[in-house]
Regions:
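Periplasmic-binding protein-like
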Residues: 493-505, 599, 603-632, 652-657
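Flexible glycine/proline-rich
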Residues: 14-17, 32-37, 46, 92, ...
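Short, low-complexity N-terminal leaders and the immediately following helix N-cap/first helix
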Residues: 1-79, 106, 121, 324, ...
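Short, glycine/charged-enriched hinge/interface segments at domain edges or termini
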Residues: 2, 6-13, 66-236, 368-378, ...
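N-terminal segment of the mature folded domain
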Residues: 441-523
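Helix-rich terminal scaffold detector
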Residues: 1-14, 179-308, 312-318, 434, ...
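A ligand-binding cleft/hinge motif common to bilobed small-molecule-binding domains
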Residues: 471-489, 580-609
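Short loop->beta-strand "edge-of-pocket" segments that line small-molecule binding or catalytic clefts
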Residues: 419-428, 522-547
Length: 661
């Protein structure tokens, strides 16, 4: 086995593509004939010509009476023409009647036109009594008749090679009597996730283990690109198991995708295993990009193997850039669907120095309907970063920042960009999740995008018109009042309203039984207390800092000096649940959060204060239907009862749902 190379050469994306194409030229893989019921989304391999006329006979396009047009000339409302009804023709039967001068036959839509007739008069312009028919409107020859071959004639091209089959094209194939169609074969793809920490979804999860995300994500991406997954597996980080899975993939598939085991850390085996198969082996090992540095490409027995990074967002980003185009080409799918869109940066963006960065972003609409790119703040290992991101911005290595409102191109993760009905940017709260659950029971298709950036970020998002509403709980140090004083401070007095939400009990989340005997914020200064803070700009963080300021005044010192004594003050997280989880698993002794989170995790709670969690809403969005539905739900007795039941520590009031400014 060859000696392992640890990212010997980091390639640019362009150089990596060039090297890949020198050894692997994606091309269609041949054709296969399949039944129409299996053909949706497939690509036609050959031109299809009509073997029959469509329709195969002259047929009525309306319910009415088949007649000779000349018999109706001169007919009008006051002077109807009278003819004799000599029979009827139903859909699907061969007409047995022949129409002579002065005669008509009743006919159904789609039925064959009887001999002698050259028009159909609509039933609305007739009056039938016994065998006599009065006609109140003249028709022209051919009127209300679909002539044989008028849709498709024998030998005419019905569909052309390379067309992707949608329900419309399948209808055409059915109309010309084809039960099967020749299509390009889908590339077969093996998807392998690697890591000792991985457990298949549905399995038992123990501490230190995580569910395998990547194989599900990548398998779905393969299907959207036009491929089919022939093997989906989880491999342990052992040479034997990983090698076995790769060999199975090479046997069953045209292309192999792995994720994980690509970095230069101990226990990562993929590079060595792939290089052990012989020449050419590993061709790319490391990209000068973020995320995606540990990407691998190899050619094994004439088949391409892509080693994607282990983090979900990194894996999908590199898949989009390198793998999707290859699979689409192999499936003979033309990129007619737009996978890039234009947007503007919602805020100033700082980039990684010296490395090209693919920055995941949310896409939201501002007041004018223009798209704004809002960077996800979690790392590439966070599943929320992946689930909420619509695509990514390509930032060159020589660019250190993008300015607010700077124009950018966003590469979409999927061609199916679904705009959100409701955009909520602000402070995280479990009660808001319960409120959205309540709405979705009656509006299951509601698309809501929630971006947790804290109360300060929520006020800024509303000020810039980026969100419909924001959850906020900012305490004004001077007045002791929540949220209302900040309308003036952010210039929102005339633009937005505060809708009363509910009271939240804030305090210190501690282990069951409170083994460290923590009684209040002052105890955080103890040497034996490990702490985790909330993110800057969040109402909870501001609440802590105000408490430290009061203590600093009492002790005749500064808040900064007190903060420096707290073990973990600089360690931040974005949610109350994250604080509770850290306490549960013994990572910290205490963190400031809401009682609801402590109850959910079976932990103890040391009350500090009660605060108001309200909704900040742009006035012009109050008439937006999803906002109206949200406010109706907020005011309902059903929601208030559910909030009390599901979220102890969140307390609605008589003012809940009222505009208070």
């Amino acid at each position: 086995m060859t000696e392992r190379k640890i990212f010997r050469t980091l390639l640019s994306l362009e150089e990596a593509r060039k090297r890949i194409l020198e050894h692997f030229s994606p091309a269609p893989l041949g054709s296969e004939e399949i039944p129409l019921e299996m053909a949706l989304g497939r690509v036609i391999a050959d031109d299809v010509c009509a073997p029959i006329d469509v329709p195969g006979f002259d047929r009525a396009s309306m319910d009415g009476y088949a007649i000779r047009a000349s018999d109706t000339f001169g007919a009008e409302e006051r002077n109807p023409v009278k003819v004799k009804v000599v029979g009827a023709v139903e859909t699907g039967e061969n007409p047995q009647v022949q129409i002579e001068a002065g005669q008509a036959a009743e006919i159904s839509t789609g039925a064959a036109i009887p001999r002698g007739a050259d028009a159909v008069v609509m039933v609305e312009y007739t009056q039938h009594s016994e065998n006599e028919l009065k006609i109140f409107r003249a028709v022209n020859p051919g009127e209300n008749i679909m002539a044989a071959g008028s849709d498709l004639m024998v030998g005419e091209h019905a569909l052309r090679k390379g067309q992707r089959l949608t329900p419309k094209e399948l209808g055409v194939l059915s109309a010309i009597g084809l039960a099967k169609v020749k299509v390009h074969r889908k590339p077969r793809v093996a998807v392998i996730s690697s890591g000792n920490e991985l457990v298949p979804p549905g399995g038992h999860l123990t501490y230190g283990k995580i569910y395998d995300i990547n194989s599900t994500i990548i398998a779905a991406a393969v299907a959207e690109s036009g491929g089919e997954v022939s093997l989906q597996a989880v491999a342990q980080d052992t040479e034997e198991d990983l090698n076995q899975k790769i060999e199975a993939g090479l046997e069953r598939a045209d292309l192999v995708l792995t994720s994980g085991s690509t970095s230069a850390g101990v226990g990562d085996l993929l590079y060595r295993i792939l290089d052990s198969y012989g020449q050419p082996g590993v061709i790319v090992h490391g990209l000068a990009v973020k995320p995606g540095k540990p990407t691998i490409f190899a050619m094994i027995n004439g088949k391409p193997v892509f080693g994607l990074p282990g983090y979900p967002t990194s894996a999908l980003t590199i898949y989009t850039l390198l793998v999707h185009p290859a699979i689409a080409t192999m499936a003979s799918i033309q990129e007619s669907e737009q996978r890039t869109t234009h947007a503007r940066c919602a805020s100033r963006v700082h980039s990684a120095r010296g490395r090209r960065e693919f920055l995941p972003v949310h896409l939201i609409q501002d007041e004018t309907g223009s798209l704004l790119a809002y960077p996800t703040t979690e790392g590439s290992g966070a599943i929320t970063s992946l689930s909420m991101a619509d695509g990514f911005i390509d930032i060159p290595e020589n660019i250190q920042f993008l300015e607010e409102r700077e124009s950018v191109d966003v590469q979409l993760f999927s061609s199916r960009l679904i705009p959100s009905d409701l955009v909520i940017i602000g402070s995280h709260c479990i009660g808001l999740d319960i409120l959205l659950d309540h709405i979705r029971r009656t509006s299951p298709n509601l698309q809501a995008k929630i971006i947790n950036v804290g109360s300060t970020g929520g006020f800024n998002a509303i000020r810039r018109g980026e969100a419909d509403l924001a959850g906020v709980h900012l305490l004004d140090e001077t007045s002791g009042e929540y949220n209302l004083p900040f309308l003036e401070r952010y210039g929102l007095r005339e633009k937005a309203v505060i809708v009363r939400g509910y009271v939240r009990q804030q305090g210190l989340i501690v282990a069951k039984g409170n083994p460290k005997g923590i009684k209040g914020i002052e105890d955080l200064l103890r040497d034996d207390i490990a702490f985790m803070n909330r993110n800057r700009g969040s109402g909870t963080r501001i609440l802590l800092d105000l408490g430290l300021k009061r203590t600093a005044r009492e002790q005749n010192t500064t808040m900064e000096k007190l903060a420096s004594k707290i073990r973990g003050y600089e360690t931040e997280t974005k949610s109350h649940s994250a604080i509770a989880s850290a306490v549960l698993y013994g990572k910290i002794d205490a963190g400031l959060g809401i009682r609801t989170a402590a109850e959910m995790y079976g932990l103890d709670f040391v009350p500090v204060t009660e605060e108001r969690y309200d909704l900040l809403i742009l006035k012009k969005r109050l008439e937006k239907d999803p906002v109206k539905r949200l406010l109706d739900a907020l005011r309902s007795d059903e929601f208030k009862a559910e909030l009390k039941k599901r979220a102890p520590g969140l307390v609605p009031s008589q003012e809940t749902g009222m505009i208070v400014n």
